[in-house]
Amino acid sequence: MWDSSYMQQVSEGLMTGKVPIDQVFGANPLEKLYKRRKPKGTVGLQCSPCLMSKATSTDDIIWDQLIVKRTLADLLIPINRQISDIQSTLSEVTTRVHEIERQLHEITPVLKMGRTLEAISKGMSEMLAKYDHLVISTGRTTAPAAAFDAYLNEHGVPPPQPAIFKDLGVAQQACSKGTMVKNATTDAADKMSKVLELSEETFSKPNLSAKDLALLLFTHLPGNNTPFHILAQVLSKIAYKSGKSGAFLDAFHQILSEGENAQAALTRLSRTFDAFLGVVPPVIRVKNFQTVPRPSQKSLRAVPPNPTIDKGWVCVYSSEQGETRALKI
């Protein structure tokens, strides 16, 4: 029980300063009931080991969770960045695919037109090759022949168009003696003397010279002085000597019409055309191998025991030093 008189005395003593505070608390009758735990030095209030262990384990769990969250955040940041990059890349790829599709739709008619033009070009080249050796007229009664004579009589020289008539005044004038004939007239007469008679055989297979045949083949080949240009010259010469230049040209155009290019056509003919089977390639003498056309130098090989054209050996180069190299396709 509280003692009211004692508490009043204590209050008055504390108010007047007569009673020190330590003395009051030291003489407190409730000291046994209220034991104050004083901290030792600067150490704070201490908890029991059980509470301390619980607090420590809770802090560790919270700290581990915080570390896990930070680790996940660090992992998700680059993943999000990569996903955004992938999305942007996919959008760009989609845009490009749509652009390519649009361009393909625009190119399709151009490709069809290109095939048509290629077919027309092949037909025209074949027609021109035959037209150069075609006799349109064998007499002087046609209107073109009369016009030719009229132009010749008026100007003294043949017209600038090709002279493709056999029996015209220009030929007689070129062959007559005692007359001054200009160079143009002489050239026209020489050309007419080489024109063949019109027949089924000469129309389908004109007897081209080796030079003319090679020039026709060159128009289909890209570049200059390539191994295929040399192959065209060799094949043209062999076909002309065997009398099969017209058949060779027809076979060449036939392969072109099948969709093959000129290089493939020449390679195929060198292996299948009867005039080239088992033929030994010609020998070409050069000062040294540096004088061989540069595009063909990489195709020079050692000469095999029995080279033939149908096995891909075009020609054999022989230098002044006695060395030999074969051109291989």
UniProtKB/Swiss-Prot annotation:
Q: Which residues form a coiled coil?
A: 70-120
Which keywords annotate this record?
A: Coiled coil, Host cytoplasm, Transcription, Viral RNA replication, Virion
Provide the VP35 IID domain boundaries. Answer: 204-329
| Consequence of substituting L104A | Complete loss of homo-oligomerization
Q: One GO cellular component from the entry? A: viral nucleocapsid
Q: Where in the cell is it found?
A: Virion; Host cytoplasm
Q: What is its main location?
A: virion
Q: Record's family? A: Belongs to the filoviridae polymerase cofactor VP35 family.
Query: What assembly does the database describe for this protein?
Result: Homooligomer. Homomultimerization via the coiled coil domain is a prerequisite for binding to L. Found in a trimeric complex in which VP35 bridges L and the nucleoprotein. Interacts with NP. Disrupts innate immune signaling in infected host cell.
Purpose:
Plays an essential role in viral RNA synthesis and also a role in suppressing innate immune signaling.
What protein name applies here? Polymerase cofactor VP35
- Species in which this protein is naturally found: Lake Victoria marburgvirus (strain Musoke-80) (MARV)
